[in-house]
């Protein structure tokens, strides 16, 4: 796919990667992905939104160059500095040293460490605007969606919102637009998985952002990955709100006890601990032998639990993999504040 004019003077210049199957080591991408980039041309200015992953540099530069010479781009809006968004900034600055980078102060500090050179910059404050001929760019600082440096850009006259990772997916579609997606089941599967991995740990921040997005007049949402939303925007916003609203399904305080037991001793400890907690009254206790239990179900239970105890024997002085796997899936933003401890047997 080449470039696509989304609105008069506003173009998609991203790259598609149908063959990608693993992203950032931990995410599986059965539908590939896209590295979305956009160009806005006004009467006297050119704005580039995002760059592309370094491996796509040459083809991406060719696309941008077909709209405007690289050395005539005035502004680069960096919504977020993760390398899949900013991996080509260094090369872009070599080709266009006069380029002004527009980003949050946090993002500019990160970029200085990434490119190791000076550059012109505009450190955006929340609510700040940039007037460019007949276009107004409004900036919304939205930290932790999903990095602390993130912002959205609203192109007021075009009713377009550029949202970085929010509302995106690892889903490569040749038609670029959400209205061109024929496999809706696959698209929403990829969208939910992307949300769970990228945005899910920051649900409260997403809800804050949604409150600010809903009042906007929107005809298009342009994410950093996946199809451009030219249809179904209210449904996407409602779905994100539903996914981000945490409703604890537990009617009373709940303690989860995941454990593994090589010879039964740690299992006996788990049973005794569970009985002791139960005898206190008023607390639900759920035991899971992680050799047999569904790890995904247990991970979800841990999210809503008030407390948890991890049980494991030691082999060569170490806790065992099923328990380590649970701990690496926890994050202070979602699991912080819970009562927790560990137990086990050794010898």
Name these PLM-found stretches.
Residues 3-65, 152-155, 159-163, 266:
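Conserved beta-strand hairpin/beta-sheet module of binuclear metal-dependent hydrolase folds
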Residues 294-347:
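Helix-loop-strand module that forms the ligand-binding subsite of alpha/beta enzymes
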Residues 49-51, 73-81, 101-104, 161-164, ...:
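Active-site neighborhood of phospho(di)ester-bond hydrolases with catalytic His/Asp-centered motifs
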Residues 268-286, 304:
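Short helix-loop-beta junction
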Residues 4-8, 46, 102-223, 229-231:
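Metallo-beta-lactamase
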Residues 55-102:
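Active-site metal-binding motif and surrounding structural segment of the metallo-beta-lactamase
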